[in-house]
């Protein structure tokens, strides 16, 4: 059984027991969270597609940890001017474990 959920402006295909890194959520480590925006639920040949969400479907998860991704390097360069600006960015994430899918 799997589902497609929306969180942080992105769509994620999830299965029960899976660990997933999503955009940072303001929830303490160890707490449970429910995702109500479920776009699709599939159990074998039984597929439910929402318009836009599946009514009554819910995905539950547990917050495992918070952290930051690897650094992304940004270089702004102006040709012929000997000008370079280097910058880096590390995006925050929340790691969750999917504990249940209810449809």
Curated annotation (Swiss-Prot):
Entry's Gene Ontology molecular function annotations: rRNA binding; structural constituent of ribosome
This protein's GO CC annotations: cytoplasm; ribonucleoprotein complex; ribosome
InterPro entries, per database record: bL21-like, bL21-like_sf, Ribosomal_bL21, Ribosomal_bL21_CS
Coiled coil: none
BP-aspect Gene Ontology terms: translation
4Fe-4S in keyword set: no
Keyword line: Ribonucleoprotein, Ribosomal protein, RNA-binding, rRNA-binding
Transmembrane segments: none
Top-level lineage group: Bacteria
Quaternary structure and partners: Part of the 50S ribosomal subunit. Contacts protein L20.
Family classification: Belongs to the bacterial ribosomal protein bL21 family.
Function comment: This protein binds to 23S rRNA in the presence of protein L20.
Protein name: Large ribosomal subunit protein bL21
Protein's gene: rplU
């Amino acid at each position: 059984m799997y589902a497609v959920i929306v969180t942080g402006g992105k769509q994620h295909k999830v299965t029960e027991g899976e660990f997933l890194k999503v955009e940072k959520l303001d929830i303490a480590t160890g707490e449970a969270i429910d995702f109500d925006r479920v776009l699709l639920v599939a159990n074998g040949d039984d597929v439910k597609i929402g318009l836009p969400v599946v009514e009554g479907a819910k995905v539950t998860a547990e917050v495992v940890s918070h952290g930051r991704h690897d650094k992304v390097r940004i270089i702004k360069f102006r040709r012929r001017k000997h000008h370079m600006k280097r910058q880096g960015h590390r995006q925050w994430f929340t790691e969750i474990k999917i504990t249940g899918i209810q449809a």
